[in-house]
Swiss-Prot record:
Keyword Membrane: no
Keyword set, alphabetical order: Disulfide bond, EGF-like domain, Glycoprotein, Hydrolase, Metal-binding, Metalloprotease, Protease, Secreted, Zinc, Zymogen
Pfam family, one: Astacin
Active site: E176
Cofactor note: Binds 1 zinc ion per subunit.
InterPro entries registered for this protein in UniProt: MetalloPept_cat_dom_sf (IPR024079), Metallopeptidase_nem (IPR017050), Peptidase_M12A (IPR001506), Peptidase_Metallo (IPR006026)
Full protein name: Zinc metalloproteinase nas-16
Cofactor: Zn(2+)
Glycosylation: residue positions: N133, N363, N438
Main location, first listed in the record: secreted
């Protein structure tokens, strides 16, 4: 995968406290991170674009603007032949237009580098490839604009992806590329009313961004995922406009991390497969871009996804509550294509259920989508699905009973784009057998996990 600029060496400061025995100890974990850096600016999709609607072609998804029935109503069609996408950059698609942002060297190509990074990411996990070609008749043209928009699927001519300064986020770039590959918004699924209560303001009632696309014009190939990069925020059309029926997901909607199921959607759509399949663990599957390794759910690593990521903090639970805190990031603001991440792996004896609760979060930016920072406790049985993300103090209730995990070990993911964040949490295992729960599947494949 192509990289832009690199930095390394981050320190995670971690403290653990045995709450029953009042014994404290400190550990410092240094791990090596290599991140690709690009300027990230702006806000969630959906700002200041209505005045430009008259110049927008039909059959295109315009993020956060009112459009009446202009969307191509097929989830995976038309597709790009041989999963090969041609693209070209408009001359203007390079430099950020916002003069108030003082960028250092290479700022004149920052948009192109972000989009190239997003294309490389997709190619690294799918059979889809991208090739720059400014003469072929069927191609994507990246265009600077004041609105963020893309056609859905391949349209057999030059098709624009409009990408303004305020859309400058890695997940937003992948979002628009997925539209160009033929994938609609998550909240356009025909089963969305099982997961959302939709309460649009009057101006948005006829907006095709919120229309359900029903069979035979759409199919579902993965579970409904509140954390998909193709989902809008809960407040995109006013307070509680897309209200999740699982309210703990309220802040997760609109998150622009790219998920395991996002890439699986592309692989299913384009029938990306390897000649032979590896025995991938924890719900992973053989990477069609590199058939010698598996694509792993967040937090898992190794060739076969049979271990947690190498740089995770390892903790051992007991039958009594223990307390820990962890500090992630630094005092320096970093603008990156990928956040600074930390993983905590809480281990317990075999077949024990782990319980964890967040007691306090500090220096977190509270926003719709938790795009600046967040904490995800991977307590659900399916290791591939996005769990509710916490980034606001009102999401934390130290008096609650906590989360009982259907996974052992239990993973906690903390990520940040903004400065140094601190999380305090308690954990233990309870006298309950994990195997006492029934196993289930996600309804789309045969991988079994505890329900």
């Amino acid at each position: 995968m192509g990289n832009l600029f690199k930095f390394s060496l981050n320190c995670i400061k971690y403290r653990s406290e045995n709450l029953e025995k009042s014994k404290m100890f400190y550990q410092y974990f240094y791990f090596h991170l290599t991140l690709s850096i690009v300027l990230i600016y702006g806000s969630d999709i959906g700002k200041d674009a209505n005045e430009h609607m008259s110049s927008v072609p039909k059959k295109i998804i315009i993020e956060g603007t009112r459009q009446k029935r202009q969307v191509v109503t097929k989830l995976f069609s038309p597709q790009w032949s041989n999963a090969k996408v041609f693209y070209c950059n408009a001359d203007s698609f390079s430099k950020l237009q916002l003069k108030k942002l003082k960028l250092k060297k290479n700022s004149d190509t920052v948009k192109r580098k972000l989009m190239k990074f997003a294309m490389n990411f997709i190619s690294s996990q799918t059979c889809v490839t991208f090739e720059e070609n400014c003469t072929i008749s069927t191609r994507i043209k990246f265009v600077d604009s004041t609105f963020c928009a893309s056609y859905v699927g391949m349209i057999n001519s030059v098709q624009e992806i409009y990408f303004p300064d305020w859309c400058m986020r890695f997940g937003s770039a992948v979002h628009e590329l997925m539209h160009a590959l033929g994938v609609l918004h998550t909240h356009a699924r025909f089963d969305r009313d099982n997961f959302l209560n939709v309460n649009l303001n009057k101006d948005d009632e006829d907006d095709s961004n919120f229309e359900i696309v029903s069979p035979p014009f759409s199919i579902n190939v993965v579970p409904y995922e509140y954390g998909s990069t193709l989902h809008y925020t809960a407040d995109v059309s006013g307070t509680n406009s897309l209200l999740p029926k699982q309210m703990e997901y309220y802040r997760t909607l609109g998150n622009r991390r790219v998920t395991f199921y996002d890439m699986l959607t592309i692989n299913t759509a384009y029938n990306c497969k390897c000649p032979s399949e590896l025995l991938c663990a924890n719900g992973g599957y053989t990477n069609p871009s590199n058939c010698l390794e598996c694509i792993c759910p967040l937090g898992y690593g190794g060739v076969l996804c049979d271990r947690v990521v190498a740089c995770s903090v390892q903790l051992s639970a007991d039958s009594y509550w223990k307390g820990s805190w962890i500090s992630v990031g630094s005092s320096v603001l970093r603008d990156t294509t990928d956040p600074v991440k930390a993983f905590i792996s809480i281990n317990a004896p075999k077949d024990k259920i782990i319980e964890v609760k967040i007691v306090k979060i500090e220096n977190f930016s509270c926003d719709s989508g938790c795009n600046n920072n967040g904490v995800e406790i991977k307590y659900m049985g399916d290791p591939r699905i996005t769990n509710p993300i916490i980034c606001c103090e009102n999401q934390v209730d130290p008096s609650n009973k906590g989360y009982k995990a259907k996974l052992n070990p239990l993973l906690i993911n903390i990520y940040t784009f903004l400065g140094k964040n601190k999380v305090t949490f308690h954990y233990r295992y309870v006298n309950e057998r994990l195997s006492s729960y029934n196993k289930t599947t996600n309804g789309y494949d045969n991988y079994e996990y505890y329900a």
